[in-house]
Amino acid sequence: MDPTMPTPHTISGTSPFPRNSSTAAEMIVTEQEHLQPRHRRSRKRDRPPPTPPSGNIKAAPAPLPEGGGHGHEEEARDEDVDRFYALLDEVREMRELWRRNGDCVATKRTSVDGGQKKQDRQQLWRPTFVMEDFAFELKGSQVVQPEKKVDSAPNLDLSLSM
């Protein structure tokens, strides 16, 4: 960016660069350019599909059958959707497994008959609390006043003055 070109910062006087000797008319034009609304960038979905390079022109797709030919695309979408939901189910299952077992610390892997690995789930102790557990009063929650001890010999004078 050219530091001599006026910008909103140089016009307002907050620029670290020295002001140039632009005319007032040039500054007004520059201000008007900055005040005009910006043009919205085109979105990907608004753009036309890209054209293939001239060297790699592919043959035109085969004509669609009488039914519209959407059956194959719908089947492919259905398969993708089914795989997606299967993946979601696996993620939920793993999350529940981690929640129940308390990470990988709680599981032991041992080999059993047939060479198959089986997980013995050794549950971690996870205490459950209910509001009744906290219903009792804590000793630290009250202001404790020291008890006054009653002397065993109440009239004993310990002063040494005579």
Swiss-Prot record:
GO terms for cellular component: nucleus. Signal peptide: none annotated. It is found in: Nucleus. Residues 37-46 have a biased composition (Basic residues). Its main location: nucleus. InterPro entries: NPR1/NH1-interacting (IPR031425). Residues 69-80 have a biased composition (Basic and acidic residues). The keyword Cell cycle does not apply. Pfam families: NPR1_interact. Residues 7-24 have a biased composition (Polar residues). One of its GO terms (biological process) is defense response. The keyword Hydrolase does not apply. Residues 1-80 are annotated as: Disordered. Keywords: Nucleus, Plant defense. Binds to and represses NPR1/NH1-mediated transcriptional activation of LG2 in vitro. Belongs to the NPR1-interactor family. Interacts with NPR1/NH1. Interacts with NPR3/NH3. This is NRR repressor homolog 3. The lineage of its organism: Eukaryota, Viridiplantae, Streptophyta, Embryophyta, Tracheophyta.
